[in-house]
């Protein structure tokens, strides 16, 4: 359906757009193209047929620029951080990237940007492409390694040769990328503590400035979830998963990295600014199919389908709009801030938290899952091991 026709979701969002005075802190771009769907991935992605791929890439790039023009004008957005995810952003041809970044520069959308991150898979990294990205303003890359063990990559249905990760990083450095994140996954079926330690050895040997290390989750509507239901994979048990996380904590501290969020570590002074914006309740807009936005208590999501996205112009095909109540916003702010290792200032907690949540904070503190350190409420070391469950109690 064309967005020029009646759209109930858009009608709900219109008051936000018309009256919005909030500053836009970040921009997320979703590039949906992949050459293969990994079995654990629940992000929207498509594998274009070879016969129509080039046309699809060009149509998508033009439509993304069009949507950005609409978003930037409506929200008077001057983002400080941009994150490009997918899909596989580096699967998009260099010419399309050149057109996209040139348009963003010409329109002044990059004027205030201090961090522009692009996700990359090792098998799609070339020097020519990275030269184009860096010339267009990209200054940070997130490398999707996931593991350096061929057995575990096969379990995840990742198709790259683990040796390509080092080569891709070398190319990125030569192109001028001085700020690199490495993505890893632990608690993969069949993975041992020794395997996790070896993955850490490899990641640290790359000289990475940042590490994102998430435990494998079995998301609905993924091949991995189906395999679990059919008994084709055996998940890592909770005790082993906790031991893996404790090993990661110890190894990263020993390597001089700052543990600034439950699943993220950085060299001093190099946390991911875009993700910090999420965790500190910033405002952001998203562009591309399935992209989500969060502005002044409103959340909305673009339709996760390329066809309807390409068929529209201007305002995106929005399918979900949620206006958070004051109660919901308090819960979300508390939950997001407590993902940070520093936590949330106790003065802010006292202002925000109602009696029910204060009782819950006291209970979790008594259970040694929360603590107050230096004027901040934060997760304890014990709380980190069950962070999602603890934070869920505060919603």
What is the predicted function of each stretch?
Residues 32-45:
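Local cysteine-cluster metal-coordination motifs and their immediate loop/turn environment
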Residues 376-380:
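Minor-groove-contacting beta-hairpin "wing" of winged helix-turn-helix DNA-binding domains
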Residues 365-375:
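A short, conserved structural fragment
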Residues 242, 354-355, 381-384:
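An alpha-helix initiation/capping motif
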Residues 17-26, 45-72, 78-353:
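C-terminal scaffold of the Radical SAM
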Residues 351-366:
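Short amphipathic alpha-helical interaction segments
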Residues 1-28, 35-36, 61, 367:
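Flexible, acidic/Gly-rich N-terminal and inter-domain linker regions that tether
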Residues 382-395:
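Short, amphipathic alpha-helical interaction segments positioned at domain boundaries
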């Amino acid at each position: 359906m064309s967005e020029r026709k009646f759209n109930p979701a858009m009608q709900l969002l219109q008051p936000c757009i018309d009256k919005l005075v909030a500053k836009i802190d970040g921009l997320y771009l979703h590039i949906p193209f992949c050459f293969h769907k990994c079995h654990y991935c629940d992000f929207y992605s498509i594998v274009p047929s070879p016969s129509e791929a080039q046309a699809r890439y060009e149509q998508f790039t033009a439509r993304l620029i069009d949507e950005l023009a609409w978003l930037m004008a409506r929200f008077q957005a001057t983002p400080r951080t941009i994150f490009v995810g997918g899909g596989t952003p580096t699967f998009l041809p260099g010419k399309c990237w050149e057109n996209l970044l040139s348009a963003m520069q010409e329109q002044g959308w990059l004027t205030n940007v201090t961090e522009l991150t692009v996700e990359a898979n090792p098998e799609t990294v070339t020097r020519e492409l990275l030269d184009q990205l860096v010339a267009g303003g990209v200054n940070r890359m997130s490398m999707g390694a996931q593991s350096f063990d061929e057995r575990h990559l096969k379990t995840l249905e990742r198709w790259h040769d683990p040796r390509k990760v080092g080569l891709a990083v070398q190319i990125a450095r030569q192109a001028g990328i001085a700020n690199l994140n490495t993505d890893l996954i632990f608690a993969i079926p069949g993975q041992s503590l020794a395997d996790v330690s070896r993955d850490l050895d490899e990641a640290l040997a790359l000289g990475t400035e940042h590490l994102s290390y998430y435990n494998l989750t079995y998301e609905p509507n993924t091949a991995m979830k189906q395999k679990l239901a059919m008994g084709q994979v055996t998940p890592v048990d909770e005790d082993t998963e906790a031991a893996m996380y404790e090993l990661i904590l110890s190894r990263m501290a020993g390597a001089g990295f700052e543990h600034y969020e439950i699943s993220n570590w950085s060299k001093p002074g190099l946390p991911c600014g875009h993700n910090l914006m999420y965790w500190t309740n910033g405002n952001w807009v998203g562009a591309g199919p399935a992209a989500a936005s969060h502005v002044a208590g409103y959340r909305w999501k673009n339709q996760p389908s390329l066809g309807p996205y390409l068929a529209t112009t201007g305002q995106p095909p929005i399918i979900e709009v949620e206006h958070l109540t004051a109660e919901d916003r308090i819960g979300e702010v508390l939950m997001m801030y407590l993902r940070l290792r520093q936590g949330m200032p106790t003065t802010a907690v006292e202002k925000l938290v109602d009696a029910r949540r204060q009782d819950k904070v006291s209970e979790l503190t008594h259970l040694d899952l929360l603590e107050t350190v230096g004027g901040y409420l934060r997760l304890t070391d014990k709380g980190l091991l069950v962070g999602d469950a603890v934070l869920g109690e505060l919603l």
